[in-house]
Amino acid sequence: MPGERVKARLTDDKKQHGFAQLQKILMPSPERQAPFCPHYAECGGCSTQHLPQSLQHSTKVSGVQDLFSRLAGLNIGEPEFVCASAGQGYRRVCRLAIKYDKKGRRAQVGFRRRLSHDLVEVDSCPVLVSSLSALIEPVRSLCNQLKSFRDLGHIELCEADNGPLMLLRHNGQPGEGDLA
């Protein structure tokens, strides 16, 4: 975050950039804020809740400008930033990971842990629009009712203009009765 002093460990050194793992914040920015999500520390669904919303927006705009410049050689100027809502409940699309828990003999539903394939099971997500967040528990229940739930890959949820949509990725043959 701009203005912060941190201790970090270099994890990957590329030709034009590097990656580091934060170890300790030595001097936090006065703009740093407490994340509102209880899963923030472990979940990989979002990583900018500690930034004020204005800095989140400018960071995203800079990223889009950089991509257009590097990949297409275009200077797009200052694009208009459109956000569904302020703070929480703004994300209209998500991909939920599904994992079969052999010990509990059930499907776990959540998001991938940050920088990992491990699953962080969640019951709700405050970043999602409320209609999608409310679907997480019913989706988990549905997955556990399917005969072939071990073959589920992931679920994508999208809040369209006409309501929520769900795309289920299935990696095998659906079980008898699963298509009803």
Q: Where are each of the predicted segments found?
A:
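Accessory RNA-recognition modules of RNA-modification enzymes
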Residues: 1-180
